[in-house]
Amino acid sequence: MTKQELRQFIRQQKQQQPALDANAILLRLKQHPRITDSQTILLYCALPDEVPTLELLERLTAQGKTVLLPRVISDKEMELRRYTGRADLTEGAFGIMEPVGEPFLDYDSIDVAIIPGMAFDHEGHRLGRGKGYYDRFLSNVPYIYKIGVCFPWQLVDEVPTDEHDIRMDCVIS
């Protein structure tokens, strides 16, 4: 199956899924040692078909952790900005809520990245939406521990990969 065929398959599966409760996934994330032991965490603002993260954003921020979110700045590039609260989010590219403020450039301080995807396999391979934003960013910071996060129906036997695709260190579903 090609990447495009798998994306289409996942879109069809999504339509057949009941509204899923993400609480168990979020609990596993909150309890993961890489999250509890980290000070600086890259997260994401969820699209409707992704595991919701707003509660996790608020919780981690309340714990005094630095939470970073991506902001798309061109067709090929994203940068990170610090999450400071819901009031400082604005709708950005692709309808994704993005933080305002100054770019965060201290990539060496990032302990863990929580990454969404359309599909993942048990080897940590990720199928994104086809734009390559995360793969390009993560290729520059290979030392960051990467956690893929998805609903159980997004976990598949095999994700087709290309040389530039970045593998997750673990997947939580």
Segments and roles (model prediction):
Residues 1-108:
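N-terminal active-site beta-alpha-beta segment that forms phosphate/nucleotide-binding
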Residues 76-173:
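Conserved phosphate- and dinucleotide-binding cores of soluble alpha/beta proteins
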